[in-house]
């Protein structure tokens, strides 16, 4: 997949929104956020691989230009391992004890905080905000739509 000139201009605009110092550069730690803001869904492990597995110090100190970032975005876009809507719904269906399209909010919180790419409590709360019904249940298809649009 290659990008059109218009897409590249849009990507550069988004990239520059993350530039905190006005030098048209971002830190490596921001790459995942920008890639996700541009519609890709790579895991943190995939981002680290694309970045060449930098140290924590490099993640916060090393800066890159848009020209260095674009091939990284390309690599994320070309990765066929990204989960689809159906993949995520299928993964959550395992926790649907009643078979009614919902999962318990408490159980989903636990899963997000302890399995796979573990999320912090704050990240989980931010993601779950407004998703539970009065019984503490979450419609997981609506939840997946929500997280894929964030």
From Swiss-Prot:
The modification Blocked amino end (Ser) is found at residue 2. Keywords: Motor protein, Muscle protein, Myosin, Repeat. The N-terminus is blocked. Residues 6-41, 44-79, 83-118, 118-150 form the EF-hand domain. SMART domains: EFh (SM00054). PROSITE patterns: EF_HAND_2. InterPro entries: CALM/Myosin/TropC-like, EF-hand-dom_pair, EF_hand_dom. GO terms for molecular function: calcium ion binding. GO terms for cellular component: contractile muscle fiber; myosin II complex. It comes from the Eukaryota. PANTHER family: MYOSIN LIGHT CHAIN 1, 3, MYOSIN LIGHT CHAIN 1_3, SKELETAL MUSCLE ISOFORM. Myosin is a hexamer of 2 heavy chains and 4 light chains. This is Myosin light chain 3, skeletal muscle isoform. It comes from Gallus gallus.
